[in-house]
Amino acid sequence: QIALARLLAGALSGTPADAAADLAVQCVPVADAVTDEAAKAFAGAEDCFTLGRGVTAAIAFECGLKLQETCYIKARAYHSSDFYHGPMAMIGKGTKVILFASGKALGGNAAPLREDSVKCANKMLELGADLYIVTDDAALFAGLPAKVLAVPGGKTEAETAQSLALAAQMLACKTSCLRGLNPDSPRALKKVTVTV
């Protein structure tokens, strides 16, 4: 939605679309293609974990929320660094895990985040998880027996986050449809909440 708004604003103002909007346009067909098999796998899932670190943690939380509200999957989202402190004990053979990982980082120093993403992926696999990695840097996970859902990356982690989020939303939407549900009309979603 944000990318479409940027494209529309650019068209109406006569100014070129920004890089993030262009990236989203490139990402749609790729994300559509790479999420097909994952959605089939998640269609039968009762629970899963979604993990990320840095900016990708927000995407992990959003993906978990979408899987909960549109697919009725008991999805639990964590920062990957926090996951090591207890929740990891819930991972066993066949536990579905989605790891969101970017090859970039805010501030430019991606090395620690990249290393942590690989460490997390290896640990999940060691514990027997059925691991799906949504990333703009498939080479980072080369050789791992995980399902890598590679999407185009941007020049920055913030731009790349948009591509990862698009893949997360497509995965939830497709999974919901495969479960015979309507992702546009979840049973308990309220558009307006009142907080006192």
Predicted features, each with a name:
Residues 1-196:
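A SIS-like phosphosugar-recognition module
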